[in-house]
Amino acid sequence: MIHVGNLGLDQLDIDDILFNVLKLSDYWIKRLEVPFYTLGRNAYMDGKTPEYFKESKILNPKLVDHFKDLYVNVQVYLTHLIGEQVYLNHEFAYPSFHIFESDPVFLNYPSNWHKDYPYETLGLKNDTSSSFTVVIDIPKSGAGLEYIDGEEKYLAYNVGDIIFHKGNFLHNIARLKEYVAGEYRITLQGHIIRHNDRLIMYW
């Protein structure tokens, strides 16, 4: 159901990614009244809006400039895992980041159990869709994914992990375990789908 691997990122790689996520803070979009942001647009929140396509054209080149090595690592890993070349596609938003700034509200924040259907908002309806997460930064108390596989289960995250799954089962971002000011939960988020006879990764 869920594949967990590791991209082999060292601390210098992680520090560079975090530096650039913060550097691009002008492109963070606050999604709720609580400190939850995305770096740019994504299909599941914005796929039916003109802003998704307009702003992605602006941000995609900046994402490549700042996270080229990360994209290459993800492409190589997923290509090997799936057994078919995976590409970026400029028609859609590139994979980008969930950013949660530590806040006491996340200790008891309501769950959002869901399945992944972002392709439907973009009119990409087919059976090749899958989702991935790359863990970039987590609180010292930990972070993870809750999911249903017969019963409720918990997958603990480690920095550098890449989590790959079909997205067709109930899952939920696990709540913050302990509030410590100044901590973040930052993950690269993306999806894979077949488009024009190629497997592409997008968000």
Language-model features, listed with the residues they occupy:
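Short, solvent-exposed loop/turn segments at secondary-structure junctions
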Residues: 9-10, 102-104, 118, 139-141, ...
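Short, Φ-rich (hydrophobic/aromatic) sequence segments
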Residues: 14-21, 78, 134-137, 186-198
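Catalytic core of non-heme Fe(II) oxygenases with the double-stranded beta-helix
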Residues: 89-95, 101-162
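Catalytic core of Fe(II)/2-oxoglutarate
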Residues: 144-203
